[in-house]
Amino acid sequence: MKVELCSFSGYKIYPGHGRRYARVDGKVFQFLNAKCESAFLSKRNPRQINWTVLYRRKHKKGQSEEVSKKRTRRAVKFQRAITGASLAEILAKRNQKPEVRKAQREQAIRAAKEAKKAKQATKKQTTQSSKAPAKSAQKQKIAKPMKVSAPRVGGKR
């Protein structure tokens, strides 16, 4: 049994019922009854007519028992350890007072500067000790005679 849908009202049309309307452009419409057909031909909007399925869908009639509100999944904050720092360390750092944090930062900067100075001092000592014997061993460079080309005469053109 082939059940069709009314092109205007959206109701089911059972075999032996309804009317078929074929437009000049070849499009075929099925109507439940003359009421639907006349409303369609007078170009009425089925969304604005109370008894049509489209109106009921638009104004959410008779759907409340079928569809319960969809639950959306919320993102939940979750704390976990990061590589190189355990969760306890992270929480301890977060709970520190700003003064303590500032003092630690300054101390770390001071230590880094001292390490840099020490490194530069050792570098200087090594360069001085290696340069001293090298100076006496150096010979004076002899200036090479440069070839002087003949002066150019005339312009480019």
Swiss-Prot record:
InterPro entries: L24e/L24_sf (IPR038630), Ribosomal_eL24 (IPR056366), Ribosomal_eL24-rel_N (IPR000988), Ribosomal_eL24_CS (IPR023442), TRASH_dom (IPR011017). It is found in: Cytoplasm. Disruption phenotype: Embryos show various defects including smaller head and eyes. It comes from the Eukaryota. GO terms for cellular component: cytosolic large ribosomal subunit. GO terms for molecular function: mRNA binding; structural constituent of ribosome. Residues 96-117 have a biased composition (Basic and acidic residues). Coiled coil: none annotated. Residues 123-145 have a biased composition (Low complexity). PROSITE patterns: RIBOSOMAL_L24E. One of its GO terms (biological process) is chordate embryonic development. Residues 95-157 are annotated as: Disordered. Keywords: Cytoplasm, Developmental protein, Ribonucleoprotein, Ribosomal protein. Belongs to the eukaryotic ribosomal protein eL24 family. Component of the large ribosomal subunit. The ribosome is a large ribonucleoprotein complex responsible for the synthesis of proteins in the cell. Plays an essential role in early embryonic development. Component of the large ribosomal subunit. This is Large ribosomal subunit protein eL24. It comes from Danio rerio. The gene is rpl24.
